């Protein structure tokens, strides 16, 4: 099992979670973060640090987020992020919106 970053992160990209990760398994894209499922040690220490509850344990319903993370890391060459940065400028505007991945990224 791994943890996954879900739709809530899209267009917000709060990075509070990255500094607490003991194995540096967060990767950064333009509009969101992902967790590398091959590097995550399933500790869950990042979960309470996400202000929008975007990080969840992998379940069969969330497997698509594992596959998306792999795609972005392997094919889009997203890079590791280990230091907190400011959230995206309009994060507060988008934080409660639903289905953001399909609307804004759609891979």
Curated annotation (Swiss-Prot):
Instruction: State the needed cofactors, names only.
Output: [4Fe-4S] cluster; [3Fe-4S] cluster
- Enumerate the spans annotated as 4Fe-4S ferredoxin-type domain: 2-30, 31-60
Q: How many and how are cofactors bound here?
A: Binds 1 [4Fe-4S] cluster. Binds 1 [3Fe-4S] cluster.
> Which sites bind [4Fe-4S] cluster?
21, 40, 43, 46
Q: Which residues bind [3Fe-4S] cluster?
A: 9, 17, 50
Does Electron transport count among this protein's keywords? yes
Keywords, in A-Z order: 3Fe-4S, 4Fe-4S, Electron transport, Iron, Iron-sulfur, Metal-binding, Repeat, Transport
Transmembrane segment boundaries: none
Write down the InterPro entries for this protein, in alphabetical order.
4Fe4S_Fe-S-bd, 4Fe4S_Fe_S_CS, 7Fe_ferredoxin, Fd_C, FdxA, RnfB_subfamily
Keyword Ubl conjugation (UniProt): no
Gene Ontology MF term list: 3 iron, 4 sulfur cluster binding; 4 iron, 4 sulfur cluster binding; electron transfer activity; metal ion binding
**Which PROSITE patterns does the annotation name?**
4FE4S_FER_1, 4FE4S_FER_2
Function, as annotated, reads: Ferredoxins are iron-sulfur proteins that transfer electrons in a wide variety of metabolic reactions.
Q: Which PANTHER family match?
A: FERREDOXIN, OXIDOREDUCTASE
User: Which named protein is this?
Assistant: Ferredoxin
Question: Which source organism does the UniProt entry give?
Answer: Rickettsia bellii (strain RML369-C)
Lineage start: Bacteria, Pseudomonadati, Pseudomonadota, Alphaproteobacteria, Rickettsiales
Gene it is expressed from: fdxA
């Amino acid at each position: 099992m791994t943890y996954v970053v879900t739709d809530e992160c899209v267009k917000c990209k709060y990075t509070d979670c990255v500094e607490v990760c003991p194995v540096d398994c967060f990767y950064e894209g333009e509009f969101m973060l992902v967790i590398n499922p091959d590097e995550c040690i399933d500790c869950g220490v990042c979960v309470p640090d996400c202000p929008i509850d975007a990080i969840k344990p992998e379940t069969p319903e969330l497997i698509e987020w594992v596959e998306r993370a792999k795609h972005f890391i392997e094919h889009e060459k997203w890079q590791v992020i280990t230091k907190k940065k400011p959230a995206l400028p309009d994060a507060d505007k988008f934080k409660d919106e639903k289905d953001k991945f399909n609307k804004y990224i759609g891979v």
